[in-house]
UniProtKB/Swiss-Prot annotation:
This is Endoplasmic reticulum vesicle protein 25. The lineage of its organism: Eukaryota, Fungi, Dikarya, Ascomycota, Taphrinomycotina. Pfam families: EMP24_GP25L. One of its GO terms (cellular component) is COPII-coated ER to Golgi transport vesicle. The gene is erv25. Constituent of COPII-coated endoplasmic reticulum-derived transport vesicles. Required for efficient transport of a subset of secretory proteins to the Golgi. Facilitates retrograde transport from the Golgi to the endoplasmic reticulum. Belongs to the EMP24/GP25L family. It comes from the Eukaryota. Keywords: Endoplasmic reticulum, ER-Golgi transport, Golgi apparatus, Membrane, Protein transport, Signal, Transmembrane, Transmembrane helix, Transport. Residues 22-184 are lumenal. Residues 34-150 form the GOLD domain. The chain crosses the membrane at residues 185-205.
């Protein structure tokens, strides 16, 4: 029974675990546009971002990284990313995280297709980022108990993401309904204005023709 339960938990964790690992190139420009990645993070979660980049000092490029959220908070800002970097921070409220990179040519460097930095990014959040081995030792938990706690945390993350998406959908729906109402009111106002204008034009022309004795 214990083996079956543990196997089921491992299967569940395999389904719930999402590997956030990306490899990409960022070309160096004199006036570069930000290259951004976006990820939802639930409230009260630990976030760990690991970077590994190519390049070296004096290669004519300066790669910078900034991590912000949809509430306007800045969680990390690194002006010269070289080699391996690791950033860890806590997120108090549910938000969309933006991880943005800029690769800028240093003064005097010539822009070319060979001027670029290759980046390997690993992004872990919540249950992925928590150290359950340390938690297991600190609380004298059985391996299956640690797996259960991890599965529970994953489920809470998924619930948080669903609630966030539902709230965002409701907000968009309310915005659409408000916009539709405004468009409808504007259409009514336009129709009434045109109707009044037509009546006024008819009365004006009637008065004009009467003054010219063209109609009785």
């Amino acid at each position: 029974m214990m083996v079956s339960l543990k196997s089921s938990l491992f299967f569940m964790l395999a389904l719930l675990t999402v590997v956030h690992a990306l490899n990409f190139d960022i070309p160096a420009k004199t006036n570069p546009e930000p290259f951004c990645l976006r990820e939802y993070v639930g409230e009260k979660n630990l976030v760990i971002v690991n970077l590994k980049t190519t390049g070296n000092m004096g290669d004519g490029q300066t790669l910078s990284m900034m991590i912000t959220d949809s509430s306007g908070n800045t969680h990390s800002s690194i002006q010269n990313v070289l080699g391996e970097k690791s950033v860890a921070f806590d997120v108090d409220a549910s938000a969309m995280l933006d991880i943005c990179f800029l690769n800028t040519l240093t003064p005097g460097a010539i822009e070319s297709e060979h001027k670029k930095r290759s980046v390997k990014l690993e992004f872990t959040v919540g249950a992925d980022a928590d150290d359950y081995s340390s938690l297991q030792k600190a609380n004298n938990l059985e391996p299956v108990e640690a797996d259960i706690r991890r599965a529970r945390d994953f489920i809470e993350e998924i619930k948080g993401k669903i609630y966030y998406l539902q709230a965002r959908e409701a907000r968009f729906r309310n915005t659409n309904e408000s916009t539709n109402e405004r468009v409808k009111n504007f259409a009514y106002l336009t129709f009434i204005s045109l109707f009044v204008l037509v009546i006024w034009q008819i009365l004006y022309l009637r008065s004009f023709f009467q003054r010219k004795h063209l109609i009785p």
